[in-house]
Amino acid sequence: MSRLQFQLQTTDGHARRGRLTFPRGTVETPAFMPVGTYGSVKGILPEQIRALGAEIILGNTFHLYLRPGLDVIGDHGGLHGFARWDGPILTDSGGFQVFSLAHRRKITEQGVTFSSPNDGARVFLGPEESMQIQKVLDSDIVMIFDECTPYPATEDVARRSMELSLRWAQRSRQAHDGLGNDAALFGIVQGGVHPDLRSRSLDGLQAIGFDGYAIGGLAVGEPEHERNAMLEHLHPRLPAERPRYLMGVGRPEDLVEGVARGVDMFDCVMPTRNARNGHYFTSFGTVRIRNAKYERDLDTIEPGCGCHACSSGYTRAYLRHLDRCNEMLAPMLGTLHNLWYYEKLMADMRAAIAAGTFVEFRRSFYAARGATTPPLPGESS
């Protein structure tokens, strides 16, 4: 039996306010999970992540398996001890990383053989191997091993990929249970941008039975309207009593639109990666600090922001100077700001859902950016 408990507390339209409870802590939803690919969120300490409001982080099964390897992580009792993070951790299965190595991989019914991006060695990964790795990592949420359907993909290609993922889902479930792992196991809905395939995938996953359901194969190049259409299609079909996780998404707008369509959990490298490239998120849009107009700008990234960078008074001019000099303090401060912004955005959405004012929140979110609020299904533009 899984250690995860999920409580759906209230809804506002399709937006959902809930709580995930694990032995290692609780996670208020909707939630954004900072990504710690190699066991650390780049440029920030674990205690700083917690102070920003994050309650769960994501680790990367694929990369941690290749380096440092399971022996080293096992010596620490798992990923929590290795990374010095005592809260819940979700680990992906390695499926997306295999997808990203298209030119180095060979997919068969058994699994995937690929060349390691580290040293070129041949490596095999299948559902059983992924479940074994995640058992050693001792994550709180384990993801099934699947094939991420590329975009664009014909319906036939997407169907064959989805059917393979379903067979792998069954093997993942059996391997996970066979290991006696009481961590939560999430299924992953595939099917590209084809509604019928998405329905078939979800039906197959529910027949197997999972603790939560992720929506995969999106944020891989498809237009935003197609992504939203898939979320709208799945919302009434997903079990209300299980958490829903939109993988690899995304921009602040994507989070708002995902929540509006019933998503509970998100992850993305965007806030940390963009910080390292001098792009800082604010309520009025993105500050691109390398722009010359910030050379003598005495404002903070966002006046009134409570992050360490803004509350300490670091100016845009100073951050631009650090960035131009390749000083490591620039991405550190930028990461603190961006993750604070993301976590506050999620907290504000949770509060709006609880208060029954999510529609107003969404309008204000776009108005602050000088943008028109996109209509939801059933609304006029």
From Swiss-Prot:
Q: What is this protein called?
A: Queuine tRNA-ribosyltransferase
The entry's keywords: Glycosyltransferase, Metal-binding, Queuosine biosynthesis, Transferase, tRNA processing, Zinc
Residues where substrate binds? D92, S93, G94, G95, F96, D146, Q190, G217
Q: What does this protein do?
A: Catalyzes the base-exchange of a guanine (G) residue with the queuine precursor 7-aminomethyl-7-deazaguanine (PreQ1) at position 34 (anticodon wobble position) in tRNAs with GU(N) anticodons (tRNA-Asp, -Asn, -His and -Tyr). Catalysis occurs through a double-displacement mechanism. The nucleophile active site attacks the C1' of nucleotide 34 to detach the guanine base from the RNA, forming a covalent enzyme-RNA intermediate. The proton acceptor active site deprotonates the incoming PreQ1, allowing a nucleophilic attack on the C1' of the ribose to form the product.
Report the EC code(s) recorded for this entry: 2.4.2.29
Assembly and interaction partners: Homodimer. Within each dimer, one monomer is responsible for RNA recognition and catalysis, while the other monomer binds to the replacement base PreQ1.
This protein's pathway: tRNA modification; tRNA-queuosine biosynthesis
Taxonomic placement: Bacteria, Pseudomonadati, Pseudomonadota, Gammaproteobacteria, Lysobacterales
NCBIfam families assigned: Q_tRNA_tgt, tgt_general
| Chain positions recorded as Zn(2+) binding sites | C305, C307, C310, H337
Family to which the UniProt record says this protein belongs: Belongs to the queuine tRNA-ribosyltransferase family.
Which residues are catalytic?
D92 (proton acceptor), D267 (nucleophile)
Q: Name one GO biological process term.
A: queuosine biosynthetic process
Query: Which co-factor is required?
Result: Zn(2+)
- The keyword Zinc appears for this protein: yes
Q: Where is this region: RNA binding?
A: 248-254, 272-276
Q: Which organism is it from?
A: Xanthomonas campestris pv. campestris (strain ATCC 33913 / DSM 3586 / NCPPB 528 / LMG 568 / P 25)
Please state what class of enzyme this protein is: transferase
Q: Which GO terms describe its molecular function?
A: metal ion binding; tRNA-guanosine(34) queuine transglycosylase activity
GO terms under cellular component: cytoplasm; cytosol
**Cofactor comment:** Binds 1 zinc ion per subunit.
Q: What reaction does this enzyme carry out catalytically? A: 7-aminomethyl-7-carbaguanine + guanosine(34) in tRNA = 7-aminomethyl-7-carbaguanosine(34) in tRNA + guanine
